[in-house]
Amino acid sequence: MVWLWVLLCVPCLWASCDHDVHNDEEEGGLSVSLTWADEADQGTDVNDVKLWIFNADDGSLVEEKHHGSTQEVASQRFALPVGHYQILAATNLIEPFFIGEATRATLNMNQLMFGLSNPSASPDHAYYGVTDIGIDKSNVNYITKNEMRHILAELTIFIEGVPDNFAMIGKVLNVATGLLPLQKNEDGTFGTASYTKEECDIPLRIAVPGETLKTETLRLMPTANGFHTTKLFIQLISPGGVVSNYDIEAPVMKSGGKYKINLEFEEMKPYMYLTSTKIDDWTEEWIYRGEILNPED
């Protein structure tokens, strides 16, 4: 028996493949392998894998499976008729994550949403990956490679020169209520933020002598769709109870992105517009250069 395995090396694109039919009557099928989009995620423990296969033409659910490991996923083969499909995989999608519209009677690829029951939970990362594939022969074996990326963004705030024992607390005001993994962004990647928004708390931190005031790394939903900036509200509180308020606008956060806000206490203004510097494929630094909140004003 001659088996042809077709490796789809680029996820999130229409899959164009060469293939041969088998020389017996046994049907072929589709297998799914998972890889990491961000090399930093190599070695991540995976103990929960959900897999959906949708008809890309009408949005209907074709298959839905739940596995305990990536090996279980790779060992399964799906017998699919000729057609156009989108394969969605999600890993570590456990509480406080939830799946919206997740009933087999109504589930449609355009309705499926990943959300957080508590927007401020900052849980360990869950991951998703999508492959778009066309099957034009039913007795050929295909294998897809889904590149898995973070559902959530990461945000860390650093403020240099904050006086000792000052407290910082705040909120991100327009994080999305969820991510729609099978809807496309303008750049063609899968995974758009919802248009509905909510707030995410920035936990209390106290300035320690000799150290930069730094938040924990927050894991949060990306900026809600329809907004051109991420909106933050921060308060610095002196030991005597004097409160200074700061309204901040920054670039949009995307799913899987890592964002670092770097500020100087002496340069902070009540209204600040932050600009971005790219550090690597996933990470941006946001700083204040003295612009007014809306540069067009």
Tell what function each PLM region has.
Residues 69-71, 95-142, 240-268:
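Structured interaction patches on ligand/partner-binding surfaces of diverse proteins
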Residues 48-102, 167-255, 291-297:
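Tryptophan-paired
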Residues 145-152, 220-226:
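Conserved "repeat-terminator" motif of extracellular CCP/Sushi domains
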Residues 1-4:
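Bacterial N-terminal signal peptides that target proteins for export
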Residues 10-40, 256, 280-297:
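Bacterial Sec-dependent N-terminal signal peptides
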Residues 134-140, 150-153, 160-169:
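Secondary-structure boundary elements
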Residues 34-46, 158-166:
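Structural motif
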Residues 146, 159-163, 225-226, 235-284:
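Exposed, polar/acidic Ser/Thr-rich sequence context and nearby capping/turn residues
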